[in-house]
């Protein structure tokens, strides 16, 4: 797939930054965005980061994001946000039920809810600038609520991002360590005189290293 991904809003501390509660939206959505992009690229997808960090106003941020998104021909635009206002859980916003993003949105909400978040489902928001003006189908993910202690205690960008990626692609990354039958040895020195080898072995033993002296023919 070819996918645009961006974190909504300016960074924290600037005009038009995101919601602030127990955590800060503009900090966390950038963490999630970076991890999502990394995972998607690992899975072989083409990804463009369309985040805007220097908008002069809310409308300027939105316009610049859409301009960046529309510069690429992609299958999907993904906008990462966090919610606020006293609720709990995750929801994904799209332009309308007939949007090409609907299935991605539903799968993403379902995937995030497996982390323990309330599933608020997919909601139509044709009034939102990004959803209305991107060329490709777009979805806006409200990951969880920044002002909900329950959500914040459950949230971790390292688990949120893989859930989003699974919702988009249906793919997961296997983090199970690969078993190896190989043994790796480290050689420190080689000497023609045994007393030199003995001296180095004694020094290493004193430092806590286990040593073995091996004799080989020249």
Provide a role label for each language-model segment.
Residues 20-27, 194-196:
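Periplasmic OmpA-like peptidoglycan-binding domain that tethers envelope proteins to the cell wall
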Residues 13-14, 23-176:
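Active-site-proximal helix/loop segments of hydrolytic enzymes
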